[in-house]
Amino acid sequence: MGAAGMSLRVVSALLATAAGHAADDSCVGHCGSWAQDCWCNDGCEAHHDCCHDYEAVCGGSSSAADLIKLDDSTARCLDGSAGAYYWREGKDPSLVLVFMEGGGWCYDPANYPTQEGTISDCRSRSQTSLGSSRSWASKRSFDEGMLASDVSTNPVFHNYSLLYMPYCDGTSFAGNVSGTVSGLFFRGLQILEATFVHAMQHTSFARASRVVLSGGSAGGTAVLWHADRIARLLTTRRQLGDVERGKRGRGGSSVEVLALPDAGFFLDLPTWQGVDVWPAQMRSMASVSNSYSSLHAGCLAKYAAEPERCLFPQYYAELIETRTMLVQSLYDSSELWYTLMLDCCAGPCSGYPTCKSGGTERSQMFALRQQHIDAWRPLVNRSGKPSEWEKSSVRASLRVGNQTVDRMQQHRASDCI
């Protein structure tokens, strides 16, 4: 396909959190009121954001996906509840879109983070849908952007089966502690691996010949950290399946894995005043959860004495073997406000003043643009594999509402899908 055919591929329809209704507070009884006002008001959060799943629960929408709890006892959310994933069968069983949900990380918000502060933040997180599966809806509707099953909304991925991975470990699916830490479970890696193993055993995933890995923000980071691991796991499982089916020596079957991370390429940067805040927060999170052991294997080998570098893709981008289409803002809001800690925007931003022309903060903002371009270069320049698509908005990730995506057709990327 040409550039025009790629317009929707680089647009992620991200759903902010995985809030769903609890089993003992079914949303079905509220369908009548939803039909009139979607029950979306100030009380929405108290009702587990049920209106988010109106179509799935009440309308029998084709966009509905079923929640599948993992039977692996090691795959646990922060609070110890079972990991899970959403599965929606697509029209073409040979195609699967995997989407890893974002939602930040488990870290101490202080400028000088401590492990105690990180654990405290994890404990607070464990009481929400980003740290527990207890409130996740048994069905969930995905009807926007690249997750939609409607061809007019999603001409590229509409016929793919969808495997949606809700986020409940706070470490971008990297936590790897066999026991508990202050009563918390850091089992992101176990959730990650158990999800793919279970899906290949119990859904049509085992028949897939093409798998696209995507995710936004912390989910996009997870794609960059884990794409090669997932590709190896799927290839190994496929080969084992071929042997069991007697295909040994006859070529067997293969699976093509492609990566499409959105807004997950975060840089190792201090604040605009030179304080090492963001990198220190990530190091504390990784130390508490033993996430270092789950990071990119090639990077860990390259920086054996400095595993903390492998938290940041800029240090290992050229080592990523999976074909990758990188989607990233040149002025990512998360980096502007939480990494650089700027309190202004280059242009009009909701809730933030415009940076003064010629000021230090404005120059830092434009320096971020060049730092991203430099960091992406090793990934982009690899012959025959990846490409990138950058945007100049301050959104942390791309979304599709009622916008016309055809305006996004021109980009600096060659087809990888």
Q: In which residue ranges do the predicted regions lie?
A:
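Classical eukaryotic N-terminal signal peptides for Sec-dependent ER targeting/secretion
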Residues: 1-12
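N-terminal signal peptide
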Residues: 14-26, 60-64
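C-terminal His-loop and adjacent cap/lid subdomain of alpha/beta-hydrolase
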Residues: 60-417
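Secreted, short cysteine-rich peptides and small extracellular cysteine-rich domains stabilized by multiple disulfide
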Residues: 23-59
